[in-house]
Amino acid sequence: MARAQDQLINMIETVARALGTELLEEVVFVGGCTTGLLISDEVTKEGIRYTDDVDLIVNVAGYAGWHSFQEQLRDKGFTVSLDDEVICRMRLDGLMVDFMPDDKDILGFSNRWYKQALESAQDYRLAEDIVIRLLTSPFFIATKLEAYKGRGNNDPLASHDMEDILNLVDGRPELVTEIQVADKRLRDFIAEEIGRLLDHDLIDYAIQGVVMGDPGRVNLVFERLEKISGLSDPG
């Protein structure tokens, strides 16, 4: 297993143990720290990028629910640092942990797919005594595509979100089938956004960067992206 992946798993486990069983049932782990957990190809895992934070989403009822949740986090050892400009960020012994509510009215931002992603999250056994909730791979792709649209500056070469997407396409052979059988609205969104991505002038370079220039894997990623882009159902 890649060193970066080992570090990421340790970070996730640290957060999970601090949260405890009860709070673990309320949150879902998302973002780049979870990419490797969804990848089944060991070669691809070697190229997983390191990220210095752990991201989670949570469903809370309005401001009162959000403040109550934050109090529970403080009781578990999470703190707010005055040095952090990210309003959803807390610290756990120096580790940056971002808790994002699925209601955009609470903090002024969210991701359009968070609510459905929470509802469809799957259990993942991280350790013998720890089970976390994780996005399904189609929702991982959808949340990353939505994030890329908002902060990627239309530059797949510089986007960590795009890097995570391409790594998952490369390292999860079953992804195309999983998207194919997903909810129509989700499937169409992914297919249409991937179609736009394939038209981008820099996508070839982005893919080459992710797969370290391996011609076989470049072709494989393109083939899977083409299949995904063809899953849109106009009807």
Labelled PLM ranges:
Residues 1-235:
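Compositionally biased terminal segments of proteins
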